Amino acid sequence: MQPESGANGTVIAEFILLGLLEAPGLQPVVFVLFLFAYLVTVGGNLSILAAVLVEPKLHSPMYFFLGNLSVLDVGCISVTVPSMLSRLLSRKRAVPCGACLTQLFFFHLFVGVDCFLLTAMAYDRFLAICRPLTYSTRMSQTVQRMLVAASWACAFTNALTHTVAMSTLNFCGPNEVNHFYCDLPQLFQLSCSSTQLNELLLFAVGFIMAGTPMALIVISYIHVAAAVLRIRSVEGRKKAFSTCGSHLTVVAMFYGSGIFNYMRLGSTKLSDKDKAVGIFNTVINPMVNPIIYRFRNPEVQSAIWRMLTGRRSLA
């Protein structure tokens, strides 16, 4: 990100994040709501992570991935919300260019890992339901760790690519970002150099990072649905759909908000709808994920309850 001298000769070395609302009287309300959402998200995801670590019944591939997903949700919301809360308290909206790039990198890192991890979870469900005889071999601990490591490596490459590409753009004014965190669409609109290459890169990498995993998820669940429909036991079908239903809900929310946010860069003006989608990406998704997995999964519910009450598992 290369700051340049603007028309008045000043050098742009920082961005002004306008936040969610301009009305000063509503800032305390925004602060309380987002602080509450942050605490609920961190508490909910850490409770699932703790349950996965200490509960023997949850020492399986599906819950291994769920524990990793909880870490990602905490990371995703921690990249954006604490800094926003700090600005609300200090009433200082200026963010240095370097800090903006750092936030951009880590946000896309966590979101990218999330993308691949959801695919790994779909593959796990496919093996468990469609290939039960070879499940333990194909989804061994080594395979699980390799899938997680590959997810981090691919996401790191993606985040670094966008961050480096963004750093090559020139910014000579204005420097007001109509958002509460630094992200690609908003920064593209402030650049005084061409962003065509950056947007093409976003679409190309986005197809690889989102399109391919989404296709793999759809294919996996087509096979899963066909296998579940062949199960004669009503209880067996119910159990299969309960574990898959939670994951499908999270996938729909994650990809739905992501596609809306990044696949409409041709818009000449970003509106408050983009802020709403930003809230969905950074706050709502990480907050509701543990709720979805907890309330739609009896094993997670009982594990968290035993952990809170100090009871030991019978396993």
Swiss-Prot record:
* Membrane association type: Multi-pass membrane protein
Cytoplasmic-side stretches of the chain, per the record, are 53-60, 124-143, 224-240, 296-315
Q: Which residues are glycosylated?
A: 8
> Can you tell which superkingdom this protein's organism belongs to?
Eukaryota
The stretches that face the Extracellular side, renumbered to this chain, are: 1-28, 83-103, 162-199, 265-275
Disulfide pairings:
100-192
Tell me one GO molecular function of this protein: G protein-coupled receptor activity
**Regions crossing the membrane:** 29-52, 61-82, 104-123, 144-161, 200-223, 241-264, 276-295
Q: Name one GO cellular component term.
A: plasma membrane
Q: Where in the cell is it found?
A: Cell membrane
InterPro entries according to UniProt:
GPCR_Rhodpsn, GPCR_Rhodpsn_7TM, Olfact_rcpt
Supply the alphabetized keyword list.
Cell membrane, Disulfide bond, G-protein coupled receptor, Glycoprotein, Membrane, Olfaction, Receptor, Sensory transduction, Transducer, Transmembrane, Transmembrane helix
The entry's family comment says:
Belongs to the G-protein coupled receptor 1 family.
Protein task: Odorant receptor.
- Please give the name of this protein: Olfactory receptor 3A1
Q: Which gene encodes it?
A: OR3A1
